[in-house]
Amino acid sequence: GAVGTTLATISAIKPALNAEELDSWVAIQADGSVVAYYGKVDLGQGLDVAIGQIVAEELDVSYRKVKIVMGNSATSLNQGGASSALGIQGGAKPLRNASAEARRILLNLASEKLNVPVANLSIFDGVISVKGNDAQKVSYAELIGGKYFNSKVEWNKRIGNPLDVKGVAKPKSQSEYKVVGLSLPRNDVAWKVYGTEGNIADVRVPGMLHARVIRTPVAGGLAEKVDESSIKHIKGARVVREKNFLAVVAEREWDAVKAAKELKVTWVANSKPF
């Protein structure tokens, strides 16, 4: 549907991944929980918690009902890097706007189903009810659970960090916040403390070697002569050279470290370093 479409657009088929598709940003599961697709990865800032709070806030669901899918190129758009403040300062905007738009559509769907104006509806934890009559209600799961909005949002035609989208709905003001600003426990603390989760340094593959790059001591310097015999005493260590790229590899990381320190290289200045 077009930007701003509210009714009769629900589909059982998910639209293709596209920044203009609301379904590329947020989904309501069959059980009423929420999945948000975040096109960045966490670099230790706890972005999954922060983004989860923002999505929960705009959709009026509890934080525990939100799952953040991060950096999966099959399901998430390219939002660029997440270093420093980029994860939230820019990266949260599309999800905030998309979640607000999803909430608007859900309210309109509930209005049609309950035959009550949107102004007379309220939301609590994913359940929309008539103000003053909590018995007259409908949940997100009943409205759209497991299906798709099939609705458009306005995309600024940028990719990476500048990417942004917006719908008709206006996100909440700070005075309305109930979830954003809460101090919630981070999901990564326990596995960092107890070492239960794998890190890149723990990866092992068959035939794997460890390497160290040998760098010139001066800008643009060239390796004129490399004495490979200087590291023969280090088990399994050998030189890798491709034009002016120089490195050492070994089966054990410490052996690669030692080889990098002990490899004798004669460097010469480059008349045109850059």
Q: Which ranges hold each PLM region?
A:
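Cofactor-binding beta-sheet edge motifs in enzyme active sites
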Residues: 2-274
